[in-house]
From Swiss-Prot:
Catalytic activity: L-aspartate + NADP(+) + H2O = oxaloacetate + NH4(+) + NADPH + H(+); L-aspartate + NAD(+) + H2O = oxaloacetate + NH4(+) + NADH + H(+)
Taxonomic classification: Bacteria, Pseudomonadati, Pseudomonadota, Betaproteobacteria, Burkholderiales
The protein, known as: L-aspartate dehydrogenase
Protein family membership: Belongs to the L-aspartate dehydrogenase family.
GO BP: NAD biosynthetic process
Origin species: Burkholderia thailandensis (strain ATCC 700388 / DSM 13276 / CCUG 48851 / CIP 106301 / E264)
Binding site for NAD(+): 128, 194
Amino acid sequence: MRNAHAPVDVAMIGFGAIGAAVYRAVEHDAALRVAHVIVPEHQCDAVRGALGERVDVVSSVDALAYRPQFALECAGHGALVDHVVPLLRAGTDCAVASIGALSDLALLDALSEAADEGGATLTLLSGAIGGVDALAAAKQGGLDEVQYIGRKPPLGWLGTPAEALCDLRAMTAEQTIFEGSARDAARLYPKNANVAATVALAGVGLDATKVRLIADPAVTRNVHRVVARGAFGEMSIEMSGKPLPDNPKTSALTAFSAIRALRNRASHCVI
């Protein structure tokens, strides 16, 4: 059992926009101690320079000086295989932000098996969407339908299959660029899949969750809408998210959900 007065020993996986924002938020929190950061080898020197000697910066789980109590992943899909699986297997509880990767059943199974083997818990962060707790609760009574609608400015879809469907730089009216299952959305739009996958895993699953993605020149932010109905009644939630100040491509709420996960881990009263 953890000493009630000792800070939770944390390893952070990734130190990009989200990781840096999380670190700044908890750096002086007496209940938490970010003692380790895992990043790719080519980033180690830069991160060491930013954090100094108080944090052990390494490129692999094997290089950790000891096993941390808790790990937070905010590094991208590849980190789940390389770092989260071995940490779970070693008995470290982990919270992950890269939910879109879990549309890969083999990866989801590998994470679940590693957690079972290590007696650890894998927590999926709610990220950029709210209402996940209500959706997961509603699932207990039975859900009839869940739909996720994601709406972004046209230029937010650059580098995706949407470029073959319309001229994203010259749009004057909204256009649906994808309609199908959450699993197919994750496959075709992997960099935009985290919210759809989170909604799906909390509700009726990746194949039954309906997804609609829209390029809309009338919006200036990413807009997420979830509609569900079931034995509980009906729900509809819409969020228009702001990005992190230093990274316009990253949802601020995603970073806040990671901060909340760390503080919940250290708290004796959690909501």
